[in-house]
Each structure stands twice: as C-alpha cells, then as structure tokens.
C-alpha cells in the first residue's frame, strides 16, 4: 500500500514524463495537418481526387495526432514501471481512444497500466522464468488487465466525459472564453514552464485533440509572451537592466519567438516581485486579445513559429504584441519605481549621517 501511495504522490512527475515525450507528435502532426489544410485553400480536408498529395500530407498529420494518445500513456507507464509498462499502457490508451476517451483516456490508461505492471514485477517467480517475465509474461498480462479495464469498464464513460468537455468548449460564449483566457494566461506565465504552466499546456493539448483551435491560440499566445515581453523590456528600458540581463534579453526574444516560456526564468529569478506579476498581466492581456479577435492555431505549440498554421494571423500577431508591450511597460515601471525608492532611501540615510556628524 505504501508503494501505491508513493506512486500516486508522484503522479505529476509521471504525467510530465508522458507529456514531454508526447510533444513531438503533437507539434509535427498538428503542423503537417494544418499546412495541408492551409495549402488546399478551402478551409477543409483536402480532397483525395482533387489534390492527392495534400490529402496524403493531411493523413500524415492525422497519424501524428493519433499516435500522441498511446505514446502519452506509454511514457506515463514507463515513468512508473519502466520498459515493461510501455505496451500495456499504449494498447490500453488505444482501446480507450476507440471510445473517444482521447487525452483523458491516455492519462487513466497510463496510470493504471503503470501500477498494474509495477505490481506484476513484484510477483516472486522461479529463476528460470525471470528472464521471460519482462518481455513475455508481464506485457501480456499487463495488456490484458489494462486494455480490459478500458474496454469493459472506463473507456465508454471517459469517452462520454471527453465528448461533453468538447461540446462545452465549442459552445462557449465570448464572456466564458475571455474568463478562460484570463485563467490560462495566469497559469502559463506564473511559473514559466513549471507544474502550473504544464497543467495549462496539457489543457491546450486536449483542445488540439478535440479540435477546439480558438483555445489553442489563446494558449499559444500566452506561452510566448513572458520571454518576448522581458526581451522587449531590456530594449526599451536599458537602464533598468544590467549588461548581462540585456544580453539575456536578446536570447529571450528568440526563445519567445519559438514558444519557449522558460526564456523569462533568468529575469524572474533575479527580481521575482516585479517580473512575475508583470509577465502574468502581460500574458492575460495577450490571451484575452487572442480570444476577442477569434484567432485559431492548429498546432500544439506557441510563439511566432506557428504563425504559418494560424488562422487570423493579424489578430494573433496583435495579441502577442499587446501582451509583450504590456509586460515590458509593467516591468520597467516597477523597476523604475524601485530605483527611485532606493535612491530616496539612500539620500535620507546620507542626510541622517550628515546630521549625526554635525551634531
């Protein structure tokens, strides 16, 4: 029981392992799919007769997005029980996906499969059987249990839950989607690639899988604003930053363009009280702008690098610009106030010293 509790305590770590291994499938599949639709020029799936090559490119993209579900589950299981859990979790997630369980089904299959395999590995066996357990017995039994649970137990209800979430997201009114944008902007900027950021990113991936591309665009904007905003801040308020920070700002601009939120971490580590609130406000402003203009992003990533697969490019660029400018202005204002307060304090201390010497 203690082992089970420990596994569940480390759930976040297991989920992050799965998500990190899934990202290449999301990015490559999503971008190839979006490129095929964009080149077709009709906002629809390319027709196999009219343009067979674009249809094949579309199918490659679909393959990438389809594989993200079993690979997510496989590496969640791998984090829990290592190699023997790969097949049971991947197959369990595939079975769950046949019911429409999608991302949630992968999470459940990965955790269940990992736990099942973990305990199967604990069963004492004769030394003759030890060599075949990890490559024969455990994968078969683990797959039967995990896939069986998804097939006859959890697959259908989880699929219904996923479908309900999709309908809710697609039916959101403007007020609701603005509130969602506020929440996602705050979460994405708060710890810049940490656990809170990853929760929001996982929600973005759910939206990719379910085709809710407006929410994907909101997250894509929120992801890139912290580094872009801090890079811009070093350009317009040079006196508020050291020479080293100004050099870091150049790297942050590049990282923001390619959707790496962690580019803002050096600034937040040096001055968290002024940087973190600024990037959170900026990300919220950018995310809300993206929601209001109705931009859509077809790839599960952020920054300007995904611009070719964005619908409503001008609105998307405007949202990024709004967020970056707000961040840069906020952080420079706060730093300027801090410098002035620091100077005033120093002057008062000098006056006190002078008075003391005269007296």
From Swiss-Prot:
Alphabetical GO biological process terms: fructose import across plasma membrane; phosphoenolpyruvate-dependent sugar phosphotransferase system
Keywords for this protein: Cell inner membrane, Cell membrane, Membrane, Phosphotransferase system, Sugar transport, Transmembrane, Transmembrane helix, Transport
Annotated ranges, domain PTS EIIC type-2: 11-344
GO cellular component term of the entry, any: transmembrane transporter complex
Keyword Heme: no
Entry's Gene Ontology molecular function annotations: carbohydrate:proton symporter activity; protein-N(PI)-phosphohistidine-sugar phosphotransferase activity; protein-phosphocysteine-sugar phosphotransferase activity
Main location: membrane
Superkingdom in the source lineage: Bacteria
Subcellular location, record wording: Cell inner membrane
Full protein name: Fructose-like permease IIC component 2
Organism field: Escherichia coli (strain K12)
Organism lineage: Bacteria, Pseudomonadati, Pseudomonadota, Gammaproteobacteria, Enterobacterales
